[in-house]
Amino acid sequence: MPTTGRATREAGKTTRKSLLRAAAEVFAENGESASVAQICQRADAYPNQVTYYFGSKEQLFVEVAGACVLRAGRRAEEAAAGAETVREYTNTLVGTLLGPCARDVELFATAMLLVARRTDLRPLITETLTVLHERGEEALLSTLVRTGWQLRAGIDVEARAFWSAIFGLAVQKAATGADFGYRLEDAVAVVFTNLQIPDEVLDSPLRPVGPLRPVDTDTDTDTDTPSPAAQEA
């Protein structure tokens, strides 16, 4: 590849990464209502670069929200990895998702609502949910199932139910703030109510498991490829 081509590609990578980093910060601070101007100011970029790399602010938001929730899921798994019982595992998992990582979960819940009017962005949501559900299945296999507890539904169904409950609680928490009304114990009970896990399973010891399978949450793959909207312009 000519030197000028490599330089252009590297510049594209740098710009796209800067926009993603800035957008993650600005969206975390201001939510979906953050403006392109705010993002560009933080990234030292121009508005037309948002259009070139992402097509629209909405697509940028959905990409950022997807990366955020995947990182939240990974952080929750890592935080719970040292748990000695199922109860401790579930408390740590849910507590992390609705505590330190609540904003990331909330952003993705907002992104899911956004695609109701931007159906062209649904594939981004679907891909993220697929990864979350697959990782949820792995988590169930490494905890509840290996205690001998028989799930009432398929493990894929239970993994989807887990995340549906987490998203619902995150939205309630964001909407009510200090009036949320759920203690950690209450939130855990809500998330796992359909599993009907008896106390003897919750208190079952967990054997150590191997390292978590790495999952790429980087959204910087085709870094200097313009968005479909830009290509059609």
State the predicted function of each range.
Residues 122-123, 144-217, 228-233:
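Hydrophobic/aromatic-rich alpha-helical bundle segments in the mid-to-C-terminal region
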Residues 14, 18, 22, 26-59, ...:
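Helix-turn-helix
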Residues 18, 22-29, 75-79, 107, ...:
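Solvent-exposed, amphipathic alpha-helical segments
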Residues 73, 78, 100-109, 120-146, ...:
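Amphipathic alpha-helical packing segments from all-alpha helical-bundle domains
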Residues 66-72:
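Short, basic, alpha-helical segments at the C-terminal edge of helix-turn-helix-like DNA-binding modules
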Residues 2-5, 10, 18, 45, ...:
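Feature detects amphipathic, helix-rich regulatory segments
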Residues 63, 74-106, 151, 155-162, ...:
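Hydrophobic alpha-helical connector segments
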Residues 56, 117-119:
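Short loop-to-helix capping motifs
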